[in-house]
């Protein structure tokens, strides 16, 4: 996990942030939702996730979109929209930092790439590109082990709400990764060979972490 410490930190902070988002917004209990302490902890983890690497911004956005969609589906958005709004303040530090960098001409290419469509469009209709990306992302040995543990844990102890939450997070993250790799200005195989194993750490940790959490989870109703 820590072979590439920044990626290891992203994985840990993302897993922790996902747990905090789940227990504060998604879980059917008021125990965490009524305690300011958990919101402060969530703010610290959310903010740290965005500041470690640019990838963290997308990961936190995924958590917010997932929570929003699940609450919308359950028709509970009106009740929790204010909580999502307060938690979204955690984006403010990275927005201010990016604005500062932009004003100083630092890291301009990190978030503005005018050639994205130029590289993306020619690769969209080539099925081989999707096969290569799927091979590097989904057939990683550690990812498969973590996924199997996750599935077995939910087979042993089914939790529909938690499973749906992690499944949506996984799907959105995979779609973003496909977009990023298809739009890379570098050779696709070389890009995957040099970076795929690092980004998969986040998914591997997510599945392993929530597989273990599911097995030990006890609902608190007060």
List each model region and its residues.
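Membrane-lumen/periplasm interface segments of specific transmembrane helices
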Residues: 61, 69-73, 80-157, 170-178
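Multi-pass, polyprenyl lipid-linked donor-dependent membrane glycosyltransferases
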Residues: 1-16, 20-21, 52
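Transmembrane alpha-helix segments characteristic
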Residues: 41-42, 160-186
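Membrane-interface alpha helices of multi-pass inner-membrane proteins
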Residues: 21, 37-54, 62-65, 92
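Hydrophobic alpha-helical transmembrane segments
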Residues: 39-44, 57, 61, 83-88, ...
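Membrane-interface transmembrane helices that cradle and orient dolichyl/undecaprenyl
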Residues: 17-38
